[in-house]
Amino acid sequence: MEPRDLSAHVAYEAGRGVEEVARDLGLDPESLVKLSSNENAYGPAPKAAEAIREYAPNVHTYPKSSAADLREALAEQWAVTPSQVWLANGGDGALDYLARAMLDPGDGVLVSKPGFAYYAMSARYHHGTVSEYPIRKSEDFEQTAEAVLQHYDGERIVYVTSPHNPSGSEMSLSEVEKLADETDEETLVVVDEAYGEFSDSPSAVALVEERDDVAVLRTFSKAYGLAGVRLGYAVVPGEWADAYARVNTPFAASEIACRAGLAALDDPDHVEKTVEGARWARQYMYDELDCHTWESSGNFVLCEVGEGTAVAEAAQREGVIVRDTTSFGLPECIRVTCGTREETERAVEVLNELV
């Protein structure tokens, strides 16, 4: 017996963990600085960590009330109804729910290149076909509706990442609205705002109230520091919000995840500290790195270093783990997550010795 043909599928390439790298290099994990996975340099929201400890004895129960409470809290934050908040086990889980709700076998999706690999992965899991539109380095990764529409051919879902990973560029709210206006009525524009808290631009959630063809993805992984908990959500139009009951994996957002999410929402000081820290780190890298960088609205900076793989491997040997962006189709670049001041300064010092 064999699985179905998976030849069109590609494996997701995550950044390597500290323990894994330390074992390979024979180093103390405590001596390494990991700036490769866009994790929160300041850790989880303290109130969330406290909630995880407090509710650990309750993990034998299903997250019925906590999930409902979290949907209500998020609905209040975004001025939508609880039914419009689709909780999931991470942003990728929310992508799967949207694919389940929207895609019939053979339906097409349009994804950016470079971009988040899971958009295409999720579509293919649900028997969709995948086309791409370019976000070009030669154009400083500018994102416009027109650039997407040049490659649009009636796809059922169009994915926009704003801020974009790995470049940090954004698509403005007016451009998202233009894209939704000029695609077919049955095309859904999904705006992935995983890094939205780090941006000064308004969220595309503002469009959800007035239209039925835009959905927005958000996560607790980045600004809230809960990547290991796996908690994300989509905000969808009210017209088809009730589809959630028919497409969601039961209890996929765990009791611990929901309790942590509720507590994190009640800890705005941590988000503010995280965002301000990222803003400082971005500027420090722009000013101090001896290589070309692109302005970013995320918690990371894309750097052109010549040979991304060689520089990333050399930095790793010096105890600084950064992301080689070859898998994004940018072999001449690396991506550096915003660390604490000490981490960022060390990374810049090491990288400047290598470029």
Please report, for each region that a protein language model flagged, where it lies by residue.
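Active-site phosphate-binding strand-loop segment of PLP-dependent enzymes
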Residues: 136-193, 197-199
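Conserved beta-loop-alpha segment that forms the PLP phosphate-binding cup at the N-terminus of a helix
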Residues: 68-71, 83-109, 232
